[in-house]
Amino acid sequence: MAKVRFRISMSLDGFTSGPEQSVENPLGIGGEGLHEWAIELASWRRPHGLEGGEVNASTAVMEESLAGIGATIMGRNMFGGHPGPWDPARPWKGWWGANPPFHHPVFVVTHHARPPLALEGGTTFTFVTADIEEALAQARRAAQGRDVAVAGGASIAQAYLKAGLVDEMEISLAPILLGGGEGLFDGVGALPELKLVRTVVAPGVTHYKFARRG
């Protein structure tokens, strides 16, 4: 059966972004350090339309996280743009340019309705104003039997974790302290249904994969 998979980079003190996030600084102060391990990987650069890159112990982790995904769910904060209702005078299309790295349907959970946004490379953003269960139902239909990825940010990840809807979770732990920002596990509580199944130590990061028991 197709799975719901979640992967995110996190600091040692549990944050997935730094403090003082803004449109100008979407990762917050120091937040770029969460992803330094990834951005030079060949397996990260390829779906972004970039050539070259490194191959190391993180390569297989990244390739595995991208393989078999048929649809992605994210929150409004990850998609970005100014908060509140969408501004037709400033038609925000995400952080990723004309050809985003997803190359499949993406469902953005938001309080504000907006028509679907089709971009190059097979990525279409659909804006879901219903609950997370409806967003997942739409993503499953679009994925056509493949897995669904929950991309973040922290608040949407928390919602799916608290609802017990995540089958696999990959935490890429970066050796930095942010001191504030979005805490991944704020209000989530224990997750007894998930067990550690793999640990990979790589340059600048340690990857922990958890899977549903049974």
Predicted regions and their residues:
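Enzymes that bind and transform nitrogen-containing heteroaromatic metabolites
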Residues: 1-214
